[in-house]
């Protein structure tokens, strides 16, 4: 009986070991970081309202990327859509005031292009990620004025809840709207 159990275990284990040997390792290891742009959490910490501010803002990103390169990171996920605003010139949503201090204005350079170029110079991939449903507080929507999707949209897919605005994921137009942003950034790249 003992020999039978051993033979049974080996006959079951052998195919598993063979499968483990046949699995190829991934072509590359992903060592990534998410850089958040909303609320000045990761970058930028403050808007660039002057030429010196622009240079300081760009240098702050260079410092982050240099540290990531030294730590052998090979990929950056940058938050390209914040909360109803973006970090690049868009025909759909305003540029975030996080970068220049004013909605709809670039800080004298294109922040997304700058991030992508600087990542590539360091041999790192750069991927844009979006915050999809949150649009911002009542205050930020008012600051955006006519640039806000809340003011522009006519199909009622933006909803307010507890003083915050959101795209309603239960409305088909929301998916169309998000897809339009994705298509825009893909064409931009």
What function would you assign to each model-found segment?
Residues 1-4:
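Positively charged n-region of N-terminal signal peptides that target proteins for export
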Residues 7-16:
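Bacterial N-terminal signal peptides
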Residues 15-27:
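Bacterial Sec-dependent signal peptides at the C-terminal "C-region" and cleavage site
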Residues 24, 69, 113-127:
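Surface-exposed amphipathic alpha-helices with a cationic face
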Residues 28, 36, 40-59, 117, ...:
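Active-site-adjacent "subsite" loops/lids of carbohydrate-active enzymes
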Residues 31-35, 76-78, 126-128:
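Hydrophobic faces of well-ordered beta-strands that scaffold small-molecule active sites
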Residues 56-85, 188-189:
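Catalytic domains of carbohydrate-active enzymes, especially glycoside hydrolases
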Residues 71-107:
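Aromatic-lined carbohydrate-binding/catalytic grooves of carbohydrate-active enzymes
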